[in-house]
UniProtKB/Swiss-Prot annotation:
GO molecular function: DNA binding; DNA-directed RNA polymerase activity; protein dimerization activity
Region (Alpha C-terminal domain (alpha-CTD)) location: 259-333
Signal peptide annotation: none
Gene that encodes it: rpoA
CDD domains per the UniProt record, alphabetical: RNAP_alpha_NTD (cd06928)
Any one annotated GO CC term: cytoplasm
GO biological process: DNA-templated transcription
Assembly behavior: Homodimer. The RNAP catalytic core consists of 2 alpha, 1 beta, 1 beta' and 1 omega subunit. When a sigma factor is associated with the core the holoenzyme is formed, which can initiate transcription.
Protein name, per record: DNA-directed RNA polymerase subunit alpha
Pfam families xrefs: RNA_pol_A_bac, RNA_pol_A_CTD, RNA_pol_L
Domain remark in the UniProt entry: The N-terminal domain is essential for RNAP assembly and basal transcription, whereas the C-terminal domain is involved in interaction with transcriptional regulators and with upstream promoter elements.
Amino acid sequence: MSAVLDKGSLVDVFSSPSVVFNQIREGYCAEFIVEPLRVGFGLTIGNAMRRVLLSSLSGFAISAVGIKGLTHEFSCIPGVREDFADLALNLKKVVLKSISGATCGNLHLSVTDGGAVFSNMISPSHDFEVVNGDLLICNVAEGVSLEMEMKVSSGFGYVSSVSVRKDEYDLEGAVPIDAIYNPVRAVNFTVKPTSAGSFAGHDKLILYVETNGAMDPKTAVLEASKILSTQARCFLNIADPEHRVHGVPCGVSTSDRNDASDLLSARIDRLYLSARARKCLNGENIVYIRDLVSRTEADLLKAPNFGRRSLEEVKKELFSKGLSLGMNLDSHG
């Protein structure tokens, strides 16, 4: 689409749109109405937000389970109606959120007299809260006891159990299960013509977001927006290439640079990493995020017990913060 602009009208054409938040179900569903947008920008922004919301937000999930007598995923569980495959499917649906800032930990479930076992029967934890307490986990025969230990880890998207090595978790005798970390369940959007005053004919973006309750839609959209903004900000360095720091969103203001410097000076505890990855990094004397981003992929893969899965975990977490491995930090002192 082309347009002839009068002098001084360029800024008006790309005026900042407004956002209206409509809550559909508190903590779970909401829609965001964005207008006015230049024609074509509704589709551009809608696609970008949808991709980030469905792929780049971190969350928590049960990634391994240990039951007395269980040695592999094909073992029978005495006194339990469900086989391990069905049990794993149910545990995959348990929604967790961190209440202490912890990025990993263990949960315990104990049943002494049989009956239906629900997720709200998981022992209370100082680190994690079960959001959907009404989820049926399994059915135990009368008079049969069941002891279950579950490993909780943080991550992105969906991780299959076959990609997890047994030495990547610290729960003895546990069997890994598929894990769904992303707190966003569904994202849809539509683009319509806006009727907002003088902007009639521009785009109106209606973004629908549904989460699992571990993160509310407003927070999810905010986090996704930060990720997109951080990644796009790298192009601002084109105007001042001599002061570019590889991978660091220098931005255009002193406050932006200070924010980046503060993040680099933070300890790696601020990152959502598994216990295994964190232990490997500590073994390499990597204490601060600055130490981590100055290493290359090859450097990390040389560390004992640090494999490709741990590497991808680190890269995704750094990406969500606008950082990357192999950064040149000379200009940060």
